[in-house]
Structure formats: structure tokens, C-alpha cells
């Protein structure tokens, strides 16, 4: 869980909420695969291991959500929205915050993410860039 507070008026980027269905939870439990550790596998393998009960497309989405949620400052709630909007972890780091939030709003059908949310994500992107440059990666 992230221990970050949202900017006033911004969507709580740090918030965690369940993002998998109950049946997905049961399948992963039976496979002895903790949800937050599926980011080390690929979608085809996860789908195959589930006997096809988790479609490849959904497995890919779940993996993206987990990877995004591991970025500092982001929780599973916004990670789910980003993953369902088609973004992966690398894109969340590099695509302009305005474009990410616009796609989420478009997909939702209403303005969930406002200008304050865009600024909050842009600030996180600057921090991530600084962390990557500082680590030499």
C-alpha cells in the first residue's frame, strides 16, 4: 500500500482497491499465485495455467495493472484504470500525463481525472525520471 496523500481536488492516485474478479481470485489462489506477483509471468502462460479460464487479453491486463501499481505513488485503483485503458508500466512513466488521463476519462465516459490529477501524475513522472537517472537505468 502506498502511504501518499492526494493533492486537493485530485483523484487519489495512491488509493488501493480490488481490481480482480472473485473468480479470478479463486483461480489464482488454486494456482498458488499471489495476485501481486503475477507480473513476473506472461499473459499466455497465465491463461494456459488457468485452463483458459482467464483469457489471454485479461491476463495481460492483470499483469499490466500489477506492474503499474508497483510504481511509487500509485495504488491499484488508478493502476486498474490505466491498465484497462491500455497503458503499460513503461508508458505510464513516459506518456504525457494529460494523454493518460484523457484516455481514462474517455474510457470512463465522464471526467474522473481532472487538472489536479494530471498535475499529480506529472509530478510523479518527474520523480520517477529522477529516480531512474539517479540509478543509472
Which role does the model predict for each range below?
Residues 1-137:
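C-terminal extensions
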Amino acid at each position: 500500500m502506498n502511504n501518499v496523500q492526494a493533492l486537493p481536488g485530485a483523484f487519489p492516485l495512491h488509493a488501493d482497491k480490488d481490481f480482480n474478479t472473485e473468480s479470478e481470485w479463486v483461480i489464482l489462489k488454486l494456482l498458488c499465485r499471489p495476485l501481486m506477483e503475477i507480473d513476473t509471468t506472461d499473459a499466455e502462460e497465465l491463461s494456459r495455467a488457468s485452463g483458459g479460464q482467464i483469457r489471454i487479453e485479461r491476463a495481460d491486463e492483470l499483469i499490466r495493472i500489477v506492474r503499474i501499481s508497483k510504481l511509487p505513488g500509485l495504488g491499484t485503483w488508478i493502476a486498474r484504470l490505466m491498465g484497462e485503458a491500455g497503458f503499460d508500466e513503461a508508458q505510464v512513466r513516459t506518456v504525457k500525463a494529460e494523454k493518460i488521463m484523457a484516455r481514462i476519462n474517455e474510457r470512463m465516459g465522464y471526467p474522473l481525472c481532472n487538472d489536479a490529477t494530471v498535475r499529480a501524475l506529472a509530478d510523479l513522472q518527474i520523480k520517477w525520471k529522477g529516480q531512474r537517472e539517479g540509478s543509472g537505468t
